[in-house]
Structure formats: structure tokens, C-alpha cells
Amino acid sequence: MLTREEVQHVAHLARLELTEEEEIQFTEQLADILAYVEQLKELDTEGVEPTFHVLDAELPTRPDQVEPYPNIEGILANAPDRADMFFKVPRILEGED
């Protein structure tokens, strides 16, 4: 069973601030989703070919082109930490600097 503390932990990792009501709501909703996934794990899928797309459709592509973004300050205004025009995030890998 999913606990409220686990939801708080995941919210913290995602840098989300949840109200008490949201914590309760998400705990219930995520517990329901996880219970459904457990039901799916019990299904016998032996011999069932994996489905990647329901419809045979290809997404249109375009050439990669560098284009200036018009509102960089607007995006960076939501960053918990930044250095000049970049998001600053905690180091997660050890080794090379």
C-alpha cells in the first residue's frame, strides 16, 4: 500500500509543493493505479505480441533548427536555482568535473 510519506518523498524529489489535501488525493489515486497495475501483472500474456502503436501512424518530422526562444526569463523565473541563463541542478554523478 502506498503511504502519504512516499507521496511526500516523490513530490520532494520532483520539487513539487503539495497541500495536505493534494497529498491525500494523490495518495489515494496513485494507490488505485498501483493496484490496477498489480492486476495487470496477473494476466497471462504468453504468446501475445507486444503492441507499440494501436494505429499504424507516423509522426511528421522536420529538420532540427536552432531558434531563439522569446521568453527565456519567463521560464527561468520558475527555476528553484539558476546560473545566468541556465537551470542549476544538484550534482548526481561523481567523477569528472
From Swiss-Prot:
Superkingdom per UniProt: Bacteria
Keywords linked to the UniProt accession: ATP-binding, Ligase, Nucleotide-binding, Protein biosynthesis
Which residues are listed as membrane-spanning? none
Q: Does the keyword Protein biosynthesis apply?
A: yes
Disulphide bridges, residue numbers? none
SUPFAM superfamilies assigned: Glu-tRNAGln amidotransferase C subunit
This entry's Gene Ontology molecular function terms read:
asparaginyl-tRNA synthase (glutamine-hydrolyzing) activity; ATP binding; glutaminyl-tRNA synthase (glutamine-hydrolyzing) activity
Q: Which residues form the signal peptide?
A: none
**Catalyses which reaction(s):** L-glutamyl-tRNA(Gln) + L-glutamine + ATP + H2O = L-glutaminyl-tRNA(Gln) + L-glutamate + ADP + phosphate + H(+); L-aspartyl-tRNA(Asn) + L-glutamine + ATP + H2O = L-asparaginyl-tRNA(Asn) + L-glutamate + ADP + phosphate + 2 H(+)
Entry's EC annotation: 6.3.5.-
Q: What is this protein called?
A: Aspartyl/glutamyl-tRNA(Asn/Gln) amidotransferase subunit C
Organism encoding this protein: Synechococcus sp. (strain JA-3-3Ab) (Cyanobacteria bacterium Yellowstone A-Prime)
Q: Which gene encodes it?
A: gatC
